[in-house]
Amino acid sequence: MSLDNLKSGLPEYAKDLKLNLGSLARSTELTEQQLWGTFLAVAAATRNEAVFSEISEEASEHLSEEAINAALGAASIMAMNNVAYRAKGWLGDDYAQVKMGLRMNIIAKPGVDKVDFELWSLAVSTVNGCEHCTIAHEKTVRSEGLTKEQIFEAVKIAATLQGVAQAIEIEASR
């Protein structure tokens, strides 16, 4: 299994990450599509080839082609939006009413349940450090019926995969 490849490749100092990966992959808080879509979207957001490759392989066993495309779409559109909305926030009130003017059609028609796409967008936004987008997507998934525990499960996946990507980069540079 690909997740096992990631875990076995982690150094001893990343044992907590290894254990967290195992626990999160067995999570029952999320549906299978929510879980593996989160793993895939976040793996893409880490920008780490090994993490993305290993997670992609395993996610393909759990997700439809539509869900794979939607998860990768969430990672891609959030890469754009997170930069734009962070900048808008930094620039202050003078920019609050400035129209974004960027196409974001995938958010309206992601090809999967809206709540799943929004959850993946939230997880990616946490990796990318966009407070505005994280809060906006949290509000949407809460209104769609997800619990705080389900939302935080996606955040834990994001945090753990980012840590795994960091450990892999550290080891590659040693």
Swiss-Prot record:
Query: Which biological process annotations from GO are given for this protein?
Result: cell redox homeostasis; response to oxidative stress
> What is the protein's known function?
Antioxidant protein with alkyl hydroperoxidase activity. Required for the reduction of the AhpC active site cysteine residues and for the regeneration of the AhpC enzyme activity.
Which positions are catalytic residues? Answer: 130, 133
- Please give the SUPFAM superfamilies that the UniProt record associates with this protein: AhpD-like (SSF69118)
Q: What is this protein called?
A: Alkyl hydroperoxide reductase AhpD
Q: Which PANTHER family match?
A: ALKYL HYDROPEROXIDE REDUCTASE AHPD (PTHR33930:SF7)
Key words of the record:
Antioxidant, Disulfide bond, Oxidoreductase, Peroxidase, Redox-active center
**Species name for this entry?**
Corynebacterium diphtheriae (strain ATCC 700971 / NCTC 13129 / Biotype gravis)
One GO MF term, please?
A: alkyl hydroperoxide reductase activity
